Structure formats: structure tokens, C-alpha cells
């Protein structure tokens, strides 16, 4: 079957897509026409995903591992270890570039410098975050669950509810309020999904941990439905009168995210 091989490739494409959309603000393609930019981004993320698959990852067989696919890479990292590392990057993408709208990096005036800094931060920082979480005893499954649920919490706050109730002029207080609310929602969802997922969950060799179900529920059900609810149904009935329209690909404060070349 296509699982888990296609899952690894999809994750390797998904994270660069978010990077170009939320983190870099479509740079370096922001000056192209919408169609040209879309094609360029599509080709770029697929090229990056395939490069990861073939040159960074491997499917070395071993006890408890699935058989290698007919077409496998020859990199140094075992393929099923890679998605959890990517999800460390996802946490930073969601918190800093969706929830906090690019803060504090939108204070960097030079667009080229900002492009380099945000990429180094999310890629290098994401790998360091994964290492730190592993160092404190979290499994890759738990890291995946945490990333999926943080994503769900941020999407609920920023896309479904448009940041409400933290929409006042005091940006520092707004950021603090959003971070606190995201932490509360994350903790509540993690506990709830773990309790639900553990009911009669099979505990046999070869069965994926319940945390992978939690990650999938957070990403594919909760976050995806919140995005559809905002984009298709206009947040009804949750939309606050006078709230902005559902955010586009880069939900950012224009005053803080306009590229300024130095």
C-alpha cells in the first residue's frame, strides 16, 4: 500500500508549502503574477519534497520496520523518523507565523535578511525543538500528537475565531492572551483526545501508538474542519460583527509584513 511511504513524502511537501506560504510570505515568488507564483511554488515544494525523500531519507529494513518500497532514498535518516522532525518545524510555523503573525521577525526591515532569518529559525529551530523534546523523554508519537494539537488550537484561535477575544490595540497583551489561550486549548485537547483514543485501543505489537491517531485527528479533522468552516461558511455562527474576512494564504498584519528592501 501507499502508507506509510506516501505519508512521509506528503509531510516532506506539506512543511515547505507552509514555509513558503506563512513564513516567507510567498517570497521569493511574491512579485510574480498569481498564476506564475502558484506554479513556481508548486514546482518548488515538490522539488524540495522529492529531494528530502531521495537524498535525506532511507527505508533500511529491520525488526518492526515496514519493507522498503520499490523506489527508496539513500540518505542518512530513517524515513519514519523524519515526520516528527518536520512537525517540530510545524510548531514554530504555527505559533510564530500564524498565531503571532510573524512577530518578532516582522521587525526586520530588510526583506532579504528577514527571508534568511525566518528560514534558519523555523528549520534549525524546529530540528532543535524536536531534539529537546526527545531529550526530555517524549516519543516521536507524542511529539506528533503535540504538533497536531497545537496546530488545531492555533487554527481555531486565528482562523476560526479571527483572534477573538484578543483583538485590542495593545499588541503585547494580544500576543500574550493568544499564547495563553493556545496553551489552554492544547492541554485540554491533548487530554481529551488521549482519553477518547485510549478507549479499547489495541495494544499489540506493530500497532501504531494512540498518539498518531491524536495527531491525525488534530490535523486532519479539527484543524481542517476549522479552515473549511472559516473559508466556506464564513465562521457562522461564530463570526463577531465587524470581524475581518477569513484570512487568505498569508494571514498577517500588513503593516508589519510588507517587504522593505534595505
Regions found by a protein language model. Name each.
Residues 14-38, 62-67, 92-116, 154-177, ...:
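Cytoplasmic membrane-interface regions of multi-pass membrane proteins
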Residues 40-56, 83-94, 114-131, 149-154, ...:
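Alpha-helical transmembrane segments of multi-pass integral membrane proteins
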Residues 12, 71-77, 84, 88-100, ...:
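Intrinsically disordered, low-complexity regions
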Residues 16-18, 42, 55, 78, ...:
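Acidic, low-complexity intrinsically disordered regions
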Residues 1-10, 29-35, 54-87, 105-112, ...:
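Membrane-helix interface and helix-disruption motif detector
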Residues 94, 146-262:
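C-terminal transmembrane-bundle signature of multipass membrane proteins
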Amino acid at each position: 500500500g501507499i502508507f506509510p511511504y506516501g505519508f512521509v513524502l506528503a509531510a516532506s511537501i506539506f512543511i515547505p508549502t507552509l514555509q513558503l506560504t506563512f513564513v516567507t510570505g510567498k517570497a521569493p515568488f511574491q512579485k510574480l503574477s498569481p498564476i506564475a507564483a502558484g506554479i513556481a511554488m508548486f514546482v518548488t515544494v515538490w522539488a524540495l519534497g522529492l529531494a528530502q525523500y531521495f537524498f535525506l531519507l532511507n527505508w533500511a529494513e529491520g525488526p518492526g520496520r515496514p519493507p522498503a518500497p520499490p523506489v527508496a532514498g539513500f540518505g542518512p535518516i530513517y524515513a519514519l523518523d523524519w515526520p516528527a522532525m518536520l512537525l517540530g518545524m510545524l510548531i514554530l510555523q504555527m505559533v510564530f507565523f500564524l498565531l503571532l503573525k510573524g512577530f518578532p521577525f516582522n521587525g526586520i526591515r530588510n526583506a532579504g535578511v528577514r527571508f534568511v532569518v525566518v528560514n534558519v529559525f523555523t528549520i534549525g529551530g524546529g530540528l532543535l525543538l524536536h531534539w529537546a523534546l526527545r531529550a526530555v523523554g517524549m516519543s516521536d508519537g507524542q511529539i506528533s500528537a503535540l504538533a497536531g494539537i497545537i496546530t488545531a488550537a492555533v487554527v481555531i484561535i486565528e482562523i476560526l475565531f479571527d483572534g477573538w477575544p484578543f483583538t485590542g490595540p495593545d499588541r503585547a497583551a494580544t500576543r500574550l492572551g493568544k499564547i495563553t489561550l493556545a496553551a489552554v486549548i492544547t492541554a485540554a485537547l491533548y487530554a481529551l483526545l488521549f482519553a477518547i483514543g485510549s478507549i479499547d485501543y489495541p495494544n499489540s505489537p506493530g500497532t501504531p501508538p494512540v498518539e498518531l491517531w491524536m495527531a491525525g485527528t488534530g490535523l486532519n479533522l479539527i484543524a481542517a474542519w476549522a479552515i473549511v468552516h472559516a473559508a466556506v461558511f464564513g465562521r457562522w455562527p461564530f463570526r463577531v460583527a465587524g470581524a475581518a474576512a477569513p484570512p487568505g494564504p498569508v494571514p498577517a498584519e500588513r503593516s508589519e509584513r510588507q517587504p522593505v528592501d534595505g
